Amino acid sequence: MAVTTTLRDGIAVVTFDNPPVNGLGLDVRRGLAEALAAANADEAIQGVVLTGGGRFFSGGADIKEFNTPRAGQAPSLHDVIAAVESSVRPVCAAINGTALGGGLELALAAHYRVARRGGEVWLPEV
């Protein structure tokens, strides 16, 4: 699975794992949207932590899906970002490595952010 949720003391730790850079492809976007909806519906969950598997938080868009039908399927990254911003549970982005482009946008949508030493954040589009 591209997205897994682990419960730890009332916190939903949502890990997205789409090697090599945790690209935000359709499976990851769907998994994140579903995990956020489930956390918001569960009164026992007090907060959500978003983190990437491996060395990257997220490298942004999944270039393997460029110019394919999957790229335009819902939910869009904008939809996922809106879900993070409007979550009734506090969301913390645990930036475990590099966060680029849409990956940084996802982290910025969270209510809180923490980063490991040596992690990089940047917008290559700028």
Feature locations, PLM:
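Beta-strand-connecting loop/turn residues
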Residues: 9-10, 55, 119
